[in-house]
């Protein structure tokens, strides 16, 4: 997994959307719900196998989204110390994110990339990459971004997807970050990016954003929208067509 897009909307608002690409044989995830763990309120879809998650938000005013793999393709081993989805929950619950980065134990944890949005003070976009040996932490500009998992997509396909995303930006009005958005504008942006996650590509299911490689592909789409002080999570099961929206705050 997976494909992730980020759209800043101004006024510390944003939309982050994730397409989850996994083997079709993996246990189906539970739809997201709000729960309390270790005294912290979280909202996330629960992985059907390991009990972790690939995307979630917490009362710490933080969103974390997981992509399998670091900077480049790697060959997985049969066993690791901990599921990467549990790392997501651990960092969602920590009080101090920078301290959490330093303390999180990643020995014998498979490579991964985290896209993190934090608005505890001001809106921050952070990329955290574990390459299997070293932690890489990068503060990102508040611009539209797209990430594609290194375990599924090589550099040429990643570039193709960046090109598709650039075209999407040109075809859709991305308002100035200093301009307050009306509700209709935010909803329109979310509808449009969901359409991108459903339809972007070149008619090749092997590399299109809605991916299908026979034994695996896109199983769900999650879109988290922050509009003023309101936070919501949209979730869609690609196979059952079941959809749910949770108002988190």
Predicted feature descriptions by range:
Residues 1-249:
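N-terminal nucleophile
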């Amino acid at each position: 997994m997976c494909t992730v897009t980020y759209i800043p909307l101004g006024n510390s608002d944003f939309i982050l959307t994730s397409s989850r690409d996994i083997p079709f044989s993996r246990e189906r995830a539970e739809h997201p719900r709000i729960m309390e763990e270790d005294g912290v309120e979280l909202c996330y879809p629960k992985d059907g196998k390991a009990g972790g998650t690939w995307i979630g938000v917490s009362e710490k005013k933080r969103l974390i989204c997981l992509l399998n793999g670091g900077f480049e393709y790697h060959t997985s081993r049969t066993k690791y110390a901990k599921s990467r989805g549990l790392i997501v929950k651990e960092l969602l619950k920590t009080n101090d994110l920078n301290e959490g980065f330093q303390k999180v134990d990643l020995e014998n944890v498979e490579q991964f990339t985290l896209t993190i949005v934090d608005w505890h003070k001001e809106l921050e976009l952070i990329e955290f990459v574990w390459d299997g040996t070293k932690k890489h932490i990068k503060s990102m500009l508040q611009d539209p971004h797209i990430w594609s998992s290194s375990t599924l997509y090589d550099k040429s396909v990643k570039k193709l997807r960046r090109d598709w995303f650039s075209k999407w930006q040109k075809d859709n009005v991305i308002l100035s970050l200093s301009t307050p958005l009306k509700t209709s504008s935010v909803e329109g942006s979310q509808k449009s990016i969901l359409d991108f996650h459903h339809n972007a590509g070149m008619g090749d299911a092997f590399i299109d954003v809605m991916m299908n490689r026979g034994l695996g592909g896109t199983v769900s789409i999650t879109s988290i929208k922050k509009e003023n002080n309101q936070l919501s999570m949209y979730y869609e099961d690609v196979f059952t067509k079941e959809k749910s929206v949770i108002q988190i705050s």
